């Protein structure tokens, strides 16, 4: 295979795609808007599932390195009620490797490896149908042409409009993210509360989730139902003001739970958006989508796993093919849509139960619902 291939986006989907192509000695151009791999904090931690994210890393040839970095103990999950009573306390067995955790930054570095990324390349538009191929427009006025453009450019994809007029909609839930560093030394009581993995608390139309990463770093997510303009447009630079609003929103919850917000350092508002559950498009030769660009869904552990596997699967199929790569892309899209629709349905229903008027619905979800395959 020697076609001109570009992937837009250096996240999990784009890097998995590029890494698998590199493994098969297939050239690919990676265009990433960020100025470099450390341009901004890489985020929290991910659990990579057997048959999804782990399978993708196996295809990329980095599964052994993943196991050296991952935290199987991070699968531990504790659920509390708002007065701090422990309702569920699940801990993985010594050989449980179903969904081990890894920091997003570690995963990024693992996939980057030998992949050559063109940093600081801001794609503004993708135009298929040209006589010479698909044209990629860049913010500085340049244009480049490729035989295949893979949009792995996330929720605000600049590639998606070439295939679909659909845009993500607000789910009705906003998350405010904050962080605690060196928690075992600075806040040992909170470290014990969180344990080795995550702790989640569900109230009426709101939830509080704390997730341990490596090096004593913890991400805390305050989630609540609110109109889109109620909190999301407020300036988060004044951490004290944001903290006060959150403490008022979660007033009446147990003091140790509120300490997760009191000791948070910086705050980021993240309104949760999603694409329609069964988002598809009429196939367009030379362009396709992966990950959030294709099927943005509520953040319940599926998105990154699907993105990784899609990137790896498409790259593997293209590397193995000897015919028209467009036929390969058609087959891939059908498979991706079917699998993504199952997970989008699951995560959409999950968000409705986890942040709902009935906190018991969240507990029931953990007790009864099994994720799709």
Regions picked out by a protein language model, each given a short descriptive name:
Residues 1-6, 12-13, 33, 38-50:
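Accessory recognition modules or surfaces
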Residues 1-5, 20-22, 47-183, 229-232, ...:
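Conserved N-terminal helical subregion
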Residues 6-27, 31-34, 150-151, 176, ...:
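Conserved mid-domain beta->alpha element of the FAD-binding
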Residues 38-39, 159-160, 297-298:
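Conserved protein kinase catalytic core
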Residues 64, 182-194, 256:
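Short helix-loop capping/hinge motifs at secondary-structure junctions, enriched
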Residues 128-131, 211-215:
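Short beta-strand micro-motifs enriched in acidic
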Residues 196, 203-206, 212-218, 224-300:
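FAD/FMN-dependent oxidoreductases across multiple families
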Residues 350-373:
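C-terminal domain-closing interface element
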